[in-house]
Amino acid sequence: MTVLSRFTFGLALAALVATSAAPLSADQAKELRIGYQKDGVLLIVKQQGALEKRLAQAGVKLSWVEFQSGPPLLEALNSGAIDIGQTGDTPPIYAQAAGSKLVYLAAAPDLGKRSGILVRADSGITKVADLKGKRVAFTRGSSAHNVVVRLLANAGLTFADIQPVDLQPADAAAAFRNGGIDAWAIWDPFFALGQRFPNARTLTDAEKAPSNRFFLAGADYAAQNPDAVSTFVQELDRASRWATAHPADLATLFSSVTGVDPDVEKIVAARDVYTIHYLDNAIIHQQQQIADAFQQLGLIPHAVDVRAIAYVPSAKARAALAQAERQ
């Protein structure tokens, strides 16, 4: 089994931690189903187990469902198969345009170091402008889709100047290695793994296209379970602060789950930023700019209003997060 296969299908190892928190109210839903990918702060939350313990105090069962990318995760969210999940910036824009009933709960900054475009070293492609007419793979509707759109624009190209190839990460990796595509836009840890492929070269990272990752919920779930949502965001914050303080342990945790070389996971951990925020005007504005660009390019059928589906936490929830940050 390849390293990439172990990453995609590897078994998770639990690392439970204790927590002291008030129980949730008794009228919450009795199950919370979270969709996740094998990276980032949500994986930390899963492995450390504190959220599971806090929910159990109110008799709420926690279950986890793994996804390889954001678009299928949000399809599951819209269908009611999961209640909460994490994606990059682009999947919720497509989901909102398609009429999905979801809300943005919180955001984590993505400074662009954890995503980029890989090319074959013998391709003759030395700058983004050289992608004109080339086969560029990414998952349609994923954060990599936005990376391609924005980096092309920065280089004076449009989306119509390339041959887009819609592939999930594992399929794109195989196509890249066998020469079936010219370039691959992808995020960590796939990005870090791809950088180690023979004959692979990093064309650029996405530092010139910074954005956010988002934690989203079904609209009905968020409205009916404010205490569970507040607890979830508090645990995201706690896990983020732990990650910032324990980079070596973080790489070990990631490697234990993904099967990826710890040295690769150290790179992944170092390129990320671990902070959590409820959505503010700046975050909403940045996401709206992406949505507007996709509508203008005809990539979504109509304009969407990001603010209309931004979750508004109660004063109690904001105070609880502020208190958690001081602990």
Feature annotation, model-predicted:
Residues 294-327:
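Conserved C-terminal helix/tail region of periplasmic/extracytoplasmic solute-binding proteins
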Residues 53-59, 275-283, 306:
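Short, solvent-exposed loop/beta-turn-alpha elements that line the ligand-binding surface or hinge
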Residues 223-301:
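Secondary-structure end/capping motifs
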Residues 21-26:
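Sec/Tat signal peptide C-region and signal peptidase I cleavage site
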Residues 90, 161-165, 170-257:
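Pocket-lining segment of extracytoplasmic ligand-binding domains
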Residues 41-42, 111-117, 200-201, 211-215, ...:
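Small-molecule pocket liners
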Residues 8-20:
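Bacterial N-terminal signal peptides
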Residues 27-157, 165-166, 182-185:
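Short, glycine-/small- and polar/acidic-enriched structural segments
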